[in-house]
């Protein structure tokens, strides 16, 4: 219901904005450079994707006019292209941008057919981040082209006038130089008025701009033709930069970025009475600095729901902390700023920290600028120690020393003296411990399975979040479906949980009944077991011959113990295997005692990626253990000898052949 309500408010706002910022039709700006397109070049069409070839992309910017001119041109080469590229779509922010179309045409047989009719252009509210509770007010101007045919060329151009005033006139952008599909012609132009300078830095390319001096301006141009597609490999780390580009920034250093940020997140502000009362309540109830931090953090995480209205300047400017407190919602910057203000009012040093959740430590190679970031968290100092917290993660529990913080690697802490990025130490002490007990009373009836799992750190946060947002029925069904992949005749009996606020440990206990645990093969009963948890969370990239790194879940620390209680004594061989390389470790141990067989696994990733020069050694270490992981129990009723247990290479192949890329079985906590 809240989402529908705010969607309605946003819709109303956008309708009003759309009426005052409807797309216009007009002439091209006088300052652009006219470039010719070679429509006849088809040399790379065979490498094109989605049924169309990109003939031209150009972007020209006038900083003095705060205007961006765009031209695109594609050739439809198949019926799939007719489906995929028969519309013109432009996104703009009506709060500060005016969209003007200059030309929309279909070129067929050398004849241009005009398609620019404002009456047919629909302005649509399109909230792509709605599922993440982010509302930015952007509109989408869409024209559905009629009578598009194979072989047609679609060409259109438009301008967006107006920069986001939150940046106070300063410019920052990234110009891409290569894409996953071929591009015949690429052109960038930047006009910088006199008295202003830009910093330029290339990534993965050595292209240099053509620089010209004009009266009152400096003009930079980048041109490139016949750009081949850059094909990437699967499971790349988010921070790995694949595509070459040119970074542009008017910010000369991080101090200038800090000065900009300080104006948005001032330290000394007046807090409303209701918020002051809440702060006083926390101080009175909690007598130590640590407990006050814990109480304030829990309030902001759990009682201030995550939702952002990020239209216009509010893409970066937070709402007043008092307003956030009263309305009980805010996005990452608003929740972080509120927490900082509350802690500062208690005399605790707390500062907001800008983060890039995707590129992380790669920011060290970027030009300084406020658009380098997509998230905000908090750094707190108690005594001589720093603590990092993410207020957008709900339901974190435990002592502040044990509360997990994502592996963001580096950030920009907004203080009076900040002049550089700050490296963030890795802080994750959590792990998952699972014990699966199979009670098999006889060789014919029903077996019982009891699964006890303790989660700590971020694993506890994620599991706690799932239980808070799903019914016990849904969780039990999901857990049962997990084991049903191994045991078809399994039924779920019950699921109970325990949550320790003091330690932050979350415990689940699952109870199952399994019919037909044993399969019959030529008079011999068989039952197979493997590391169910580790096997399920690990996946293998398709591209094993790597020239790019591949990602691993990090952190990832799991211990799994399988206890099999049997109706009679069993012959079983004990064994132990240790695998260790620069990226991960796996320890597996098998032992037996009278009527019991024990399987024990420890798995941990040491980092979030494997570099290409490490891949060969990585796979070699996996292959060493392909005969020691899985266990098969066999029982021959016709023989008098004891039943036996043995390793099964099939299961180790399944397990270790996929010991690479980990996908969490629980949803990570909310947050931008």
Feature annotation, model-predicted:
Residues 4-13:
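Sec-dependent N-terminal signal peptides
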Residues 8-9, 298, 666:
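A periodicity- and composition-biased signal for non-globular, repetitive helical segments
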Residues 14-18:
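Sec/Tat signal peptide C-region and signal peptidase I cleavage site
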Residues 19-662:
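A sensor for short, sequence-defined functional sites
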Residues 663-672:
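C-terminal membrane-anchoring or membrane-association module
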